[in-house]
């Protein structure tokens, strides 16, 4: 199969194991059947902004040209640090976008990828966010009214648990199972005073515990883990190829190295299978 296209990303769905597909322009190609087979990705030398389509020499914020990175709300610092939201100050880059994506219910969750971490995502992005991170377990623990408020909650909880994934550990093997419900209960106990203060500030309905949720177990299509974690860099070498041995999160794992497909979302690639 020879597929050439402008932009590529991975679409995933929560099944056992997770099902992946390359989204190639207007079509999708299942990737799970390619595991165990030879696969080649070739960067064709062009990058097109995922927002405006402009050709750019460099991809900013994983897929944008520099002008869009500077003007779009989705590229602002508050996306990575939601507690720094400045919508109320009247300085949001795109107020209508902020109303749609930030002034809506968010879920605070625990996930086990390379170890237990706390994270946030829009309610509509469950379970996609967990699959993107390569989590083997996940548990929603709070429903919060806005993105900024979820950022305040995350900031409180990360004093007790990590908020980052160790991608090298993620690709070395399965994380040891964790009792996420017990971790949730411990967090609610140790951070109870801080959570109460946030509820008093924003209202009881704004920050609601999800104590009845059950952990989700997630399995990925992996034949084997790489013997050595070597990352392909298409900017230095335009070809990534080898036998595809597994997929986890946004990573394709070959017997020759690994590649984070999200990093190359705006790149024009050719796929040979």
Give the predicted meaning of each segment.
Residues 20, 26-33:
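Phosphate/adenylate-binding glycine loop and adjacent helical scaffold
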Residues 95-97, 216-236:
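Short boundary/loop segments of OB/S1/cold-shock single-stranded nucleic-acid-binding domains
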Residues 105-109, 249-254:
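Short aromatic-glycine-enriched beta-strand elements
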Residues 159-214:
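Long, charge-rich alpha-helical interaction segments
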Residues 258-271:
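A short macromolecule-binding patch
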């Amino acid at each position: 199969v020879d597929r050439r296209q402008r932009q590529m990303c991975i679409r995933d769905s929560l099944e056992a194991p997770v099902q992946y597909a390359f989204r190639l322009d207007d079509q999708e190609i299942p990737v799970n059947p390619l595991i165990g087979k030879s696969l080649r990705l070739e960067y064709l030398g062009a990058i097109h902004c995922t927002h405006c389509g402009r050709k750019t020499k460099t991809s900013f914020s994983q897929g944008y040209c520099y002008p869009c990175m500077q003007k779009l709300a989705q590229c602002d610092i508050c996306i990575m640090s939601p507690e720094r939201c400045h919508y109320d100050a009247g300085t949001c880059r795109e107020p209508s976008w902020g109303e749609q994506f930030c002034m809506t219910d968010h879920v605070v969750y625990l996930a086990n990828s390379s170890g237990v971490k706390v994270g946030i995502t829009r309610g509509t992005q469950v379970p996609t966010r967990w699959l993107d991170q390569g989590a083997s377990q996940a548990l929603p623990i709070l429903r919060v009214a806005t993105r900024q408020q979820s950022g305040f909650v995350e900031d409180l909880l990360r004093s007790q648990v990590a908020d980052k994934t160790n991608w090298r550990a993620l690709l070395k093997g399965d994380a040891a199972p964790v009792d996420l419900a017990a971790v949730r209960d411990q967090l609610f106990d140790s951070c109870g005073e801080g959570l109460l203060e946030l509820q008093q500030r924003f209202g009881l309905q704004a920050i609601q515990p999800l104590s009845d949720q059950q952990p989700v177990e997630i399995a990925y299509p992996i034949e084997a883990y790489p013997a050595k974690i070597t990352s392909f860099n298409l900017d230095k070498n335009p070809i990534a190829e080898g036998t595809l041995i597994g997929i986890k999160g946004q990573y394709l794992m070959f017997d020759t190295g690994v590649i984070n497909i999200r990093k190359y979302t705006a790149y024009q690639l050719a796929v040979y299978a």
